[in-house]
């Protein structure tokens, strides 16, 4: 009988290692929650906690004091519920598809109602059950994505019976430009939100996303729901596409700590002659004798094809440029600057870490950190750690 493939063996076989620092996640939550108190701070853990594993990440936020958790779909909420304690509340940002209302109510999950149709369906279930059902009510204040329009809101206020069947916990909206402090759209959305709330006296409200928590107290209201900032991205810094050196030396303004070192394993090192072509299409041509290394990750692992002949990895302080096209399962690096024998089969190189942050990789991909983070995939060995005072202990 063959022995089972152990977790240690799986990790060794993986093309790279994604390390998730739970202590940094807790720090980021606490830093935001402390700064905006007494406003309650929720955690957005949709898309499997931005790709980092909601079943591990959400409990870390809970330990830091979080009791309100937002996901996008009902299925995400149902899957996460067993990993949280009974006093935690789960909210579904996209609301409910027809026919799922009873399951949502049965599970004790709160939907965000984004349209009159969703309101009517939720109220109809409340009538059948003979009790008011809790929910959040979202208004569109300028993003034109989700939420009741001004006309729908007028119609809703005219239907007293409909409103009486729902226990509205929060009126919410979403900032379209919260990560741009100087954008006038923020003030316009705030004004619209304030006007809406004047027609719903004493109703708690939520407007601030990650960027909104840095715009000032007038945006905080009763509940904030940061997302990307919890995962180590300064919302103001993520759009900085300035010179790389200036970008790397820029200090985060908001005590947000990076949470995910990412490394990849070398699978081959070789010497090539002048004129050798590298990768699909031969888009890189060696301009002299050089040493190259191939690492075992590619665009299937969230390292997008747009990094071809553009991005880099690091070994120690040495930058190793990506040469040739990024393949599905591999990337080739120019390692000529390293002494011969430095890299060998199984050596690890840094893709995200102290030498280049997630924002830097996103910039090289011409995208945003959200897209990289949620695309990292499940082929990495995932290691959850707590880092305290320079010491690291791996969790089970």
Curated annotation (Swiss-Prot):
CDD domains in UniProt: PLPDE_III_AR
A single cellular component GO annotation: cytosol
Gene Ontology biological process terms in this record: D-alanine biosynthetic process
Gene3D superfamilies from the UniProt entry: Alanine racemase (3.20.20.10), Lyase, Ornithine Decarboxylase, Chain A, domain 1 (2.40.37.10)
Catalytic reaction(s) noted: L-alanine = D-alanine
Known function: Catalyzes the interconversion of L-alanine and D-alanine. May also act on other amino acids.
Protein name: Alanine racemase
